[in-house]
Amino acid sequence: MALLHSANPADQIIVALDGMAPDQALAFSVQVEGLRWVKVGLELFVQAGPEVVAQLREQDLRVFLDLKFHDIPATMAGACRRAAALGAELITVHACAGSEALNAAQSAAMEGAQSSGQPSPTLLAVTVLTSWEEQRLQRELAISQGIAPRVSALAQLSATAGIGGCVCSPWEAAALRAQHPEPFALITPGIRLKGAAVGDQARVMGPAEAMTAGATQLVIGRPITRANDPSAAFNACCRELRT
């Protein structure tokens, strides 16, 4: 299903439930008034199991399942079929898995959703993780290609394979949006409010800047989840997007 840019700031923000125990994640999701989207990552999924997706959906939340599948085509297809059957509406796969695996994953996800009566999901290709810096990418992985051209190439590979969007740093959003107009989705982590700590993200940007650059939705974790008042922090992000 095509994921179109929403004018509602609450729909533009996906809150990452990283670092939370299952009961904390479920309680937090109820606590933040106006919350529409949450991200379930590896840590929470491994601890809570697939049922956490159903539990969050019972709270009328939409789920971004960020497990970054990267395997042979048959395995990726099976995983994406199961993920879509759970009701996850955004599902991540690694673009580096290649076109055959991406094609298989896309087809299987649609089959899984349809057979289970769930919403049609949007698969998102992971290009270059926002924790990478160019020099370290070259030093540790022997990749001489710069981050920007590598992201561009992987996004093009994904779009050609029928994937509905990609995860990218906000710093790559403008260039990718110029190459891939909507409904191709651009989901950007690495979002920080002014004055907030950067943490382990190397390529960050403010919410309004990222949306202006072409992002469809923003993934925001610690600036909201670790705030003294998460609801106030969420509302502050929404206000920034309205300006």
UniProtKB/Swiss-Prot annotation:
GO terms of molecular function: orotidine-5'-phosphate decarboxylase activity
Active site, per annotation: K68
Entry EC number(s): 4.1.1.23
Ligand binding (substrate): 18, 39, 66-75, 130, 192, 201, 221-222
InterPro entries: Aldolase_TIM, OMPdecase, OMPdecase_AS, OMPdecase_bac, OMPdeCOase_dom, RibuloseP-bd_barrel
Pathway named in the protein's UniProt entry: Pyrimidine metabolism; UMP biosynthesis via de novo pathway; UMP from orotate: step 2/2
Reaction(s) catalysed (UniProt annotation): orotidine 5'-phosphate + H(+) = UMP + CO2
Enzyme class: lyase
Subunit details: Homodimer.
Family to which the UniProt record says this protein belongs: Belongs to the OMP decarboxylase family. Type 1 subfamily.
Functional note: Catalyzes the decarboxylation of orotidine 5'-monophosphate (OMP) to uridine 5'-monophosphate (UMP).
Entry protein name: Orotidine 5'-phosphate decarboxylase
Species: Synechococcus sp. (strain CC9902)
